[in-house]
Amino acid sequence: MLQDMDAAEIDYVVVQSQYRRTHEACVEHNNQLLTLVRRWPQRVIGFAVLQPMVGAQALDELRRCLDNGIRGVGELNPYAQGFAINHPDFLRLVETCIAYDVPLSLHVSEEVGRYYLGKSTTPLRHYYWLACRYPELKLILAHWGGGLFFYELMPGVRKALRNVWYDTAASPLLYPTGEIFEVALRCVDHHKLLFGSDYPLILFPRRQMEPDLHSFREQVKQLPLPAEIRAAVLGGNAAHLLKLDVVSESTMPAPGESNARAEQPAVQPTTVEAPVHGFMAVAMVAEHWPQTRAVFERYGIPWRDSPVPFWEPIVQAAAARGYGPTEQRRLLDELNAAIT
């Protein structure tokens, strides 16, 4: 890897892991990564891999890694690792990342197109929900965020995703390099783009036998971009995000600080008050008042997030199923009766 870095004129590399399903596998990988970081501290930056569903163990492992020089978390994959983005254990991990001011990198796949190994089914709206819920989180969405960046053309979405970065990992396997950069730079500020490779994945299988870091980087260097944008995308943005351009030690907890923060951060609930009204989101009502789920089911309105966006209001869901104003009022009456 160091030889490939030198050939591509890369100073630092961020090493992330495959998404491990067990806590033990995460710890094993993190130990290997810490060995690399200690041996080449001026070349290798490590991101910890964690299994959020083990709860406090994952938080303890994160603190151990941060205390020993790890600079972020990822790449995590909700689909492959078996956790929901709104699960309390994952949200505690998110809040710990916020407390330590370290970025979190998540695997994202485009929702259309061909199937390939590693393509996940987590909807883009789940990542959008996370960014809305935690605007202070430094969130990296891998693989161009599955195309989520396009929606930043909408001013409200751009504001909601202001603390989201998109990396370019594996880009040549999905998109022509010139076209994807042209589109992305029309949608988002160039400071939100991070050069990623997915090394040691072979990005040009028709002409490569071995992986390298040079080929894709050279494609980006040849794009007709202003020099300052090219430099930012190829490294400057990542250096700023990881605070390599300031005092590096300032982002790490002082020795012993993690012990003082050892308690689990409480997941802050969204404030919801009765009574239910027609413009409350179906999924939100069902989450906060489980007793309303049977009412939704009687009306044939799905409340689980898999088929229903978290933002869909009750009146829209009811109207889409043919319920007029009278039935909608009866639905609201039954929902409110269920929670009293």
PLM features: residue spans?
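Active-site gating/metal-coordination segments in enzymes
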Residues: 11-12, 20-118, 170
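Conserved, mostly hydrophobic/aromatic
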Residues: 5, 33, 65, 73, ...
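A general structural detector for well-ordered alpha-helical segments in enzyme core domains, enriched
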Residues: 1-4, 29-36, 61-65, 89-93, ...
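Domain-level signature for proteins that mediate thiol-based redox and metal-cofactor handling
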Residues: 263-340
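Catalytic pocket-lining loop regions of alpha/beta-barrel enzymes
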Residues: 70-72, 82-195, 255
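Conserved residues at the C-terminal ends of beta-strands
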Residues: 16, 76, 196
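Mid-to-C-terminal alpha-helical segments outside catalytic/metal-binding sites
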Residues: 1-12, 188-194, 203-267
